[in-house]
Amino acid sequence: MKNAAMLSIGAYVPPYELSNFDLEKMVETSDEWIVKRTGIHTRHIAKNETAGDMAAKAADLAISRSGISKEEIDAIICATITPDFFCMPSTACITAEKLGLNKGITAFDISAACSGFIYLLEIGSALIKSGAKKNVLIIGTEKLSSIVDWKDRATCVLFGDGAGAAVLSCMDNKNNGISKPYGIIDIHTASDGNKAELLMTPTKNSNIKDIADENLGFLHMKGNEVFKIAVQTLSNDVVKILKKNNVKPEEIDLFVPHQANFRIIEAVKNRLNFTDNQCVVTVGKYGNTSSASIPIALNEAYENGRLKNGSLILLDAFGGGFTWGSALIRFGL
C-alpha cells in the first residue's frame, strides 16, 4: 500500500512585531498580565500582506527544501479562517498563481480553525495514498489581525499572523532504509459543534443572539471554558493515538502542539509526561497563529536542528468548531 511522507517544511511571518509593551499603549493591559496568562511576549502583524501573500512565501521555502520541483506539485490545499476573499476565489487558487504552479492544478481551501494543519495532513495524505495525487502542497495561513477587535484586551493580545507549509509526497522509492513505522503513520481528526459559540467569528448570517452589529466579524472567545475543554480533549486524543500505534511518550522525538497558550501546552505536556526537550514551544514569539502555528513551530525546530530526517514527531491541535486532531509522523525520507 502506498504511503505519504512529509518531505519538507517552511514558514513565513511578517516583519512587523507588536510587543506586549506596544499593546499597553492600545488597551488596558500589561506585559506582566499577558505573559502570566498566556506566555506570549510578542506577535507578528501583516500590514500590507494577505493570507495568500504569506502562504506563497512559506510554500516557496517548503518547496525549495523538498527536492520536488514546482512542476511536480499536483495539488495545493490551504487551511485558513482569514481568506483573501470572502467566499471566492479560494486562497489556494490565489497562492497557486503567485507560486507559478501548473495551470489546472487541484486547489481548494478548508476551514478547521486552529486544527487546520492536522486536517490538511489527513486530506493530503489520503489523496496520495489513494493514488489520486503524488505531491501535495499544504499550507496553513492566517491574517488574524484582520478579525481581532483591537479594543478587546481579552482577545487582541493572543493572536498573530503568519503561514506555514509542507510538501507531502508518495513514499515510493523514498524509504532510504529507515525501518517502519515511517512517513505519515497515523492521523486522527474530530469535531463537536455543540459548543461552537464558545469560540467563533459571527456574521449577520450567524443568527447569534446578544451580539451587537458593531461586534460582528470579530473573533469572540470564552477563554476559561475553552481552556478546560482543550486540555482534556487534547490529552485524551494524544493518549489514544500513541496507544493505537504502540508508541510510548519517551519514544517521541518532538511533541509539537498547537501554539495557543503556554498554559495549555504545559498542562497537556505534564499530563502526558513529555519533557521540555521533547516539546516545541513558539507561542511566546508568535502568539496564536491558528492553522499556521504547528508548521511555524515545525519550521523553527527544523532551522534550529531539532527536527531532522527520521525524527518521530507528534502533533496535536484544538480549535473553533470545536475541531481537534493529532498526527504521528516520521519526518522526511
UniProtKB/Swiss-Prot annotation:
It catalyses: malonyl-[ACP] + acetyl-CoA + H(+) = 3-oxobutanoyl-[ACP] + CO2 + CoA. It holds the Pfam family ACP_syn_III. Pathway: Lipid metabolism; fatty acid biosynthesis. InterPro entries: ACP_syn_III_C, ACP_syn_III_N, FabH, Thiolase-like. The keyword Transferase applies. It is an enzyme of class 2 (transferase). Keywords: Acyltransferase, Cytoplasm, Fatty acid biosynthesis, Fatty acid metabolism, Lipid biosynthesis, Lipid metabolism, Multifunctional enzyme, Transferase. One of its GO terms (molecular function) is beta-ketoacyl-acyl-carrier-protein synthase III activity. GO terms for cellular component: cytoplasm. It is found in: Cytoplasm. GO terms for biological process: fatty acid biosynthetic process. Its EC number is 2.3.1.180. Residues 259-263 are annotated as: ACP-binding. The keyword NADP does not apply. The active site is at residues 114, 258, 288. Its main location: cytoplasm. Belongs to the thiolase-like superfamily. FabH family. HAMAP family: FabH. Catalyzes the condensation reaction of fatty acid synthesis by the addition to an acyl acceptor of two carbons from malonyl-ACP. Catalyzes the first condensation reaction which initiates fatty acid synthesis and may therefore play a role in governing the total rate of fatty acid production. Possesses both acetoacetyl-ACP synthase and acetyl transacylase activities. Its substrate specificity determines the biosynthesis of branched-chain and/or straight-chain of fatty acids. The last Arg residue of the ACP-binding site is essential for the weak association between ACP/AcpP and FabH. Homodimer. This is Beta-ketoacyl-[acyl-carrier-protein] synthase III.
